[in-house]
Amino acid sequence: NSNNHSVLGDWVWAQPEDKVTTIFEGVSKIGKSKGYNVDFYDSNEDIRSISDIDIKRTVNYARNYDQIVVVVGDNSQRNLKSKRTAGENMGRANLNLSGKQLQLVKKLRQVNKDVIVVYVNGKPIAEPWIDKNISGVVESWESGTTAGTAVAEVLFGDMNPGGKLPLTFPRSVGQLQMIYNHKPSQYFHKYAFEKVTPLYPFGHGLSYSNFEYSEFVVSEVVNDKISISVDVTNDSEFDGEEVVQLYFRDSYSSVTRPVKELVRYKRVVIASGETKTIDFHLDIKDLAFYDINMNLCV
């Protein structure tokens, strides 16, 4: 996926080469401008067909380099037909990496512990081993014609990422109850061989900065309005952007309410060492819900 048009996703026909910046092209351009020797090795243009021989050859090639970036995920290009692993009319029975991509990552990790994984995908990928053993994972999605430039800027630190997940990543396809509207009095029974928490929850996302939250204050209700504030400190050496998220939970209700409901968020730029007070303002109606008789109430 590092040097093809999988970054375009489904429902996009074949594009001219000069109209799309692949991930390799983006990394190569920025890397060479910084004095790095950047090279590319294609394990197999068909994700489904990566073989043990392909993996062995890739690993032998990678031994000569100080840093390895492996691009894995799905390929939903409509014009590829039999080589597609995702997209419309391409159902999947699991959320794992297709073929032997995980084995490829594991073998590369054996020769270089600083492997970075870049995902190109249009759906969640459930690979707990990668989360546990790989030091850096970039979720690039199918981000379009300039995806290569965007990914390269993140990898080289020219851009400090600050995105948050718009959905939940379960640990496996069997983690069916990965929901936020179960009864607050009881989550659900434990799995025999699986954790009950997701691999990555809704709203998760890391950056090169580290943000600490403190001084959370909720005002009294005045004229059906509530004010909430929280101090956010960037205690890292990097200026960064943080998406401050405000969630609401109704602990006692006549009907089952979500245990985690996003009601407000703000994206803020916070310099290294800086503390900002973030204010949210809610109307009571923002917390309203329909009761058992379908009447709107708070």
Can you describe what each PLM-predicted range is?
Residues 1-298:
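C-terminal non-catalytic regions of proteins with extracellular/luminal or membrane-system context
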